[in-house]
């Protein structure tokens, strides 16, 4: 038996040697198609334990590929995961054998090589940090990519998504959810499901549902909600937004306003749902939470679910992972402009202006992206003619769980109020951690797109995976003088990427609601706003009180119905001391 085991190990090693020497995938490791769907009938049987040979094989492969065991299981599209409903042929025809790989980067040479190879092969960079880069590509292209990379990168990658078509298919609302919407609608007054979550946030919603939902909120809560139009898209659609606040009569002072936007990149569905969740939570909690009431009395909030309606609709109808808007370019077969690379401040489109097929194409000129131009003109008009003072801007994206502050285009110079930007960002990160124990990293936006800057000290500019000029973050901060501007990249850290399961909608919304509450407290001043009352914000509706009342039904003295958990109650000990000292922001503002 011992001799047999030794021979088995040698056989596996002999078969595995080509894997480490040849930069390519084996079809056995990354199947083009998932296994047949399991039976729909309740004939479940216990899974047989793994045999000695199977466990030995898995261990050897994991060690050869340097893949931690926990990363080999429960992955989207993992070959051991049998889909209940296999992806239709149309999705497989569009996405083929695409996978998503994560490359671990350690030095400038690796970053430069990866950036150059991605540009040469027109690859889709999903996300990047100072430690890793996620890239979507076809399995057939993997050997070509690895052949352009140094040897250190040829073995420092792992698959995040093995079967992109299946993962995309699973990201769309299920047929059961669609049936629920057809029967119950999407009214905020709809009875809650068994988990007390409003049905609107049980799944991602198409634009055709979001707009009527916004109108309904406006009609139900007209005393504090208005539906406004930011501008028009390339295809002629309105860019709707909700303006929330309690407007005092005859107040000559400029109204302090916070802008929260999402969906600049069409495929980032979680950003759209999160904007809606935070807006809904502020609206419905106004009469039940003194902190929310004070916040809406001091500030107006502008919530823009998606700056890119054309692209968002396109992700629902044609291509789930489309990024740009849908306007024409010089190449008819490569439409679209990246709406977060087309803003006028430090626009660096000269480098990529001749490549409309790039996922980060900024257009031929600053503000070539129609929706970004409309947004900027609306913002300027608000300050010039509508007595508005923008005090904060939050641009929601996905993914990688990062809180970024200016500047994006360069790490030099530092923003004038760097200390305050960092202080508030750290406070937001703490609020998120106490909400659902998720960790968000805080950094300058330039560092978030550069590799290992803290590890490698050099006077030379560090190479970048993506272009970073022309961002909305920098424009609002510099040109519009919005002192507290942030880009927040939401869940997750790459297990699903842009295809985040619907179960994450409510937890992510809870995290960003508390982030907005911390932002409001910081802007109001510690004495003016007071500590957040976590217990007040975390109440669930009592039995029989599942309906959300409209303006005419609200009882100012009843605070029992607040509909959501905004904090993980398993972390009580950590939160009890938080109001006393950890939440005590140091008042170090630079006047």
From Swiss-Prot:
Its GO biological process terms? cell wall organization; proteolysis
Q: What is the free-text note on the cofactor?
A: Binds 1 zinc ion per subunit.
Pfam families xref list: Peptidase_M14
User: Which stretches are tagged as biased composition: Acidic residues?
Assistant: 546-559, 573-582
Binding-site list for Zn(2+): 265, 268, 397
- Chain sites annotated for binding substrate: 265-268, 323, 340-341, 398-399
First-listed, main subcellular location of the protein, grouped into a coarse class: other
State the needed cofactors, names only.
Answer: Zn(2+)
- From the Swiss-Prot or TrEMBL record, state where the protein is found: Vacuole; Secreted
User: Which stretches of the sequence are propeptide?
Assistant: 22-175
Q: Which residues does the record list as glycosylated?
A: 350, 381, 386
Q: Reply yes or no: does the keyword GTP-binding apply.
A: no
Q: Which cysteines are joined by disulfide bonds?
A: 334-357
Which keywords fit this entry according to its UniProt record?
A: Cell wall biogenesis/degradation, Disulfide bond, Glycoprotein, Metal-binding, Secreted, Signal, Vacuole, Zinc
Q: Which InterPro entries match?
A: Peptidase_M14
Lipoprotein as a keyword of this entry, yes or no, is: no
Write out the GO cellular component annotations.
extracellular region; vacuole
Q: What segment(s) does the record annotate as region Disordered?
A: 533-591
Signal peptide span: 1-21
Q: Which GO terms describe its molecular function?
A: zinc ion binding
Entry similarity comment:
Belongs to the peptidase M14 family.
Outline what the protein does: Inactive carboxypeptidase that may play a role in cell wall organization and biogenesis.
Entry protein name: Inactive metallocarboxypeptidase ECM14
Q: Name the encoding gene, please.
A: ECM14
């Amino acid at each position: 038996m011992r001799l047999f085991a030794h021979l088995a190990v040698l056989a596996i090693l002999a078969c595995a040697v080509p894997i480490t020497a040849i930069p390519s995938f084996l079809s056995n490791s990354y199947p083009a198609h998932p296994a047949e769907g399991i039976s729909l009938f309740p004939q479940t049987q216990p899974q047989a334990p793994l045999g000695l040979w199977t466990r030995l094989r898995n261990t050897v492969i994991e060690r050869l590929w340097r893949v931690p065991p926990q990363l080999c299981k429960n992955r989207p599209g993992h070959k051991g995961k049998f889909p209940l409903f296999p992806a239709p042929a149309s999705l497989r025809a569009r996405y083929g054998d695409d996978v998503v790989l994560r490359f671990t980067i350690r030095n400038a040479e690796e970053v430069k090589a990866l950036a150059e190879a991605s540009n040469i092969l027109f690859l889709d960079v999903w996300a990047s940090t100072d430690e890793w880069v996620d890239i979507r590509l076809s399995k057939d292209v993997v050997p070509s990519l690895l052949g352009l990379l140094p040897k250190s990168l040829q073995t420092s990658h792992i698959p995040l998504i093995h079967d992109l078509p299946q993962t995309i298919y699973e990201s769309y609302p299920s047929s059961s959810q669609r049936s629920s919407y057809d029967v119950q609608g999407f009214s905020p007054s709809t009875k809650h499901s068994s988990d007390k979550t409003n049905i609107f946030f049980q799944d991602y919603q198409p634009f055709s549902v979001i707009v009527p939902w916004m109108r309904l909120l406006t009609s139900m809560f007209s005393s504090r909600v208005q539906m406004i139009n930011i501008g028009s898209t390339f295809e002629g659609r309105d860019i709707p937004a909700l303006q929330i606040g309690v407007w005092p009569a005859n107040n000559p002072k400029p109204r302090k306003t916070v802008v929260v936007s999402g969906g600049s990149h069409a495929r980032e569905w979680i950003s759209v749902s999160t904007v809606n969740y935070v807006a809904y939570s502020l609206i419905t909690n106004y009469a039940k939470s003194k902190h929310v009431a004070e916040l809406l009395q001091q500030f107006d909030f502008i919530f823009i679910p998606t700056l890119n309606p054309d692209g968002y609709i396109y992700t629902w109808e044609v291509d789930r992972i489309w990024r740009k808007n849908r306007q024409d370019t010089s190449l008819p077969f490569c439409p679209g402009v990246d709406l977060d690379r087309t803003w006028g401040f430090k626009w660096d489109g000269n480098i990529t202006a001749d490549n409309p097929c790039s996922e980060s194409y900024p257009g031929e000129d600053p503000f070539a992206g129609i929706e970004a131009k409309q947004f900027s003109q609306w913002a300027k008009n608000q300050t010039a003619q509508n007595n508005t003072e923008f005090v904060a801007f939050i641009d929601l994206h996905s993914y990688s769980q990062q809180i970024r502050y200016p500047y994006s285009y360069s790490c030099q110079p530092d923003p004038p109020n760097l200390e305050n930007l960092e202080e508030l960002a750290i406070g937001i990160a703490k609020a998120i951690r106490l909400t659902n124990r998720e960790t968000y990293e805080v950094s300058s936006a330039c560092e978030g797109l550069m590799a290992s800057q803290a590890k490698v000290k050099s006077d030379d500019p560090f190479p970048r995976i993506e272009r970073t000029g022309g961002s909305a973050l920098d424009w609002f901060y510099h040109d519009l003088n919005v002192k507290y501007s942030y880009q927040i990249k939401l869940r997750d850290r790459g297990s699903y990427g842009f295809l985040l399961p619907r179960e994450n909608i409510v937890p992510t919304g809870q995290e960003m609601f508390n982030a907005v509450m911390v932002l409001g407290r910081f802007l109001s001043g510690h004495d003016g706003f007071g500590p957040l009352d976590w217990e007040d914000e975390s109440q669930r509706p009592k039995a029989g009180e599942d309906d959300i009342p409209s303006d005419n039904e609200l009882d100012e003295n009843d605070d029992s119905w607040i509909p959501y958990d905004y904090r993980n109650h398993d972390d009580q000990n950590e939160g009890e001391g938080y109001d006393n000292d950890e939440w005590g922001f140091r008042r170090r503002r630079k006047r």
